[in-house]
Amino acid sequence: MDGTNNTIPLQFGKQAQTYDINALIARFIRPKESFLINSVEKESESKLNSKSTTLQSSDSEDWDSEENEDDITDVGVPGSHEIMFPGHSKIVTTTTFDKNGSRFYTGSLDNTIHCWDLNGLSATNPHPFKIIDPTDTNADNVGRYPVSKLSCSTKNQILALYTHSQPILYDRDGSLIVRFSKGDQYIRNMYNTKGHIAEITDGCWQPDSSQIFLTTGYDSTARIWDVNRTKSQLEVFVHVPEGSHTGLSRIPVTSCAWNPAKPDNFATAVLDGSIQFWQKGSRTKRPVMKIKDAHLPQQGISCLSFSQDGNYLLSRGEDNALRVWDLRNSNKCVNERIDILTPKAGGNAIFSPTQKLILAGSTAVNSMKAPLFVLDAMTLDTKATLFFDSKSTVTASVSAVSWNEKINQVSLGSADGNAYVLFSPNESIRGVKDAAMRPPKSKHIDDDLSSTVHINSLSGSAGTSDFGLVEETTESASAYFLEARRRRNAVRKDPKLSRQPQVGRLLEENSVDDIPLATMLNEDPREALLKYADVAKSNPMFTKMYSETQPTPIYQGVTEGDISSEEGNPSKKQKR
C-alpha cells in the first residue's frame, strides 16, 4: 500500500512542487578558502569554551556550511553567502542600494550604470533590468565619461557623478530626471560661477534628506545643490591654498562627507593632504576646522566617512594609509594602518551599522584573490579577511564597498567588472536572500539548445551552424535567439554579406513607354524639333510653293548705317 500511495495522487488538480529552502540557499555558500578569521580571536574564544573543538579544527575536513556561517557571522559581517552580478567590462568603481534594499546599482569605468531589481532577480543568472548609457540617447553631445560615484537619497533618487562637470539625477527606474548646469570656465572667481567648471570627484546626499546634496571637483570647490534648483548651486565653498590669492591657483578637492550628527557640517579632502571642515550657511565661507598633513600631499584622499555619533572620521588615501581621527582632539589620529593597499579606482572604506567595524577593500598581492579587510573600528586590527577570485587577467582588487543596514547585506565592486552582494541566511532579510530562496524556473523542452532547430537557419541566416542546428552555448534559448536576431539584422544591412541581388525594374517603368506624353519632362525640345529638320527640308508642307518660285531664299539686306540710325531713333525701337 505504501508504494501505491506514492504513485497515486491523493487529491485532484495540479500538485504543488515543494523545494528545500536550505538546499536552494546552499548553492551560494562561500567556500572556506575565501575566509581568514584572525587567529587571536579564535584562541580567545576556544579558551572560553574548552569543550568545543570547532575553532581548533577549523582547517580540518569536517568543516561544513553551518560552521562557515557561524565563523563570519560572529565577526559581525553577513558574508557567509554571495551572489555575483556580472556585466561590466571594466572596473566597478561604485555600488549602492536604495533605501529599502530592493534595488541595487553599480557604476563602472565602462561609462555605464547597471540597475538591478532584487525582487525579480534570477540568482543563478542575474541580468540588470536597465543599463544607463548617456551616449545611447545623445551620442552627439555627450562623450564617454566613467562613473565615479553613485548615491541614493531617502526617496530613492540616484545621484550619478561622471568624470565631467555636471551632476545628473535619475529616478529608481533609471530614467533621467534632471541634468544640473555647469559653470563658465572663463570666469576666474569661483564664487561667480553657477556650477563646476572641471571634473567632479565626489558627492553625497545630506543625511535624511532627498533635496540637498554636496559635490566636490577639480576646480577647488565644494558646492551644495538643491534638486529643485537646476540652473545654479545653492552655495560655493572655495579652497584657497596657503600663500596664494583667491582665484590665482586651484587645487583639486578629492572627496567629501556629511556629518550625520550635525547635518549642516561637512568635511572635504584636498589634494595637498589636508582635511577641512565647513558649515552650511556660513557667511565667511571659510573652514571652521582643518587637519593639516592628514595624508601625503599630491597623493589624493579617496574616501571620507563619519561615524554615526559624529565624533570619529575615517580617511583613506592613495598613499595606502587608513586613519581614524577623533574630532574632539584632531591633533593626531587615533590609529592608522599603512599596509592596506588602496585600489587605483574607487578604494573607499566604510563603518559598519554598529560602528564597531570598518570594511576596506584592497588589491591582491602575490595572488589572484582580492581581499576585503574587516577591521576593528578603534584599534584597526584585522578581525577577518574575505577573498574574492578574479575572473580576468586584471590585478584583482575590491574597489568599492557599501552596506545596507535595513536588509543587512554588503555589496562589493571588483576590478574584473563583477559586483558581489554578501548575505547571511540568518542575519539578512529580503534583498538577494529572497532571490537565493527562489526556486529555478521550470524549463521548456525547447530550452534544450542541443535538440532545438532554429527555423530561420534553414535559409542560411546568421547565428546558426550547419544543418540548421543551433550553435552550442550556455545561454538560455530566449537570450540566444535574441542575439541571433540582432546579428541577422546587422547582416541584412550589408549588401555583400546578405547577397542582395540587383534591383529590377518596377511595373510602372515597364509600361511607361505605352503612356503618351509620360516622358515629356525628360525630353529636350530642341532635340525633338531637329528630329524633323530633314523631313521639313525635303518635303515642306507649308512653304512648298517657294521651292518653285524662289528656290534660293532672298533676304533683305541690312547696312551698318541702317543699324546705327535705328539705334539712334528710339521711336523705331520695339516697345516691350
From Swiss-Prot:
Disulfide bonds: none annotated. One of its GO terms (cellular component) is nucleus. SUPFAM superfamilies: WD40 repeat-like. InterPro entries: G-protein_beta_WD-40_rep, WD40/YVTN_repeat-like_dom_sf, WD40_repeat_dom_sf, WD40_rpt, WD_repeat_GAD-1. Residues 59-73 have a biased composition (Acidic residues). Keywords: Repeat, WD repeat. GO terms for biological process: double-strand break repair via homologous recombination. Residues 41-78, 547-576 are annotated as: Disordered. Residues 49-58 have a biased composition (Low complexity). WD repeats lie at residues 87-126, 195-235, 248-288, 296-335, 393-433. PANTHER family: GASTRULATION DEFECTIVE PROTEIN 1-RELATED (PTHR16017), WD REPEAT-CONTAINING PROTEIN 70 (PTHR16017:SF0). This is Uncharacterized WD repeat-containing protein C343.17c.
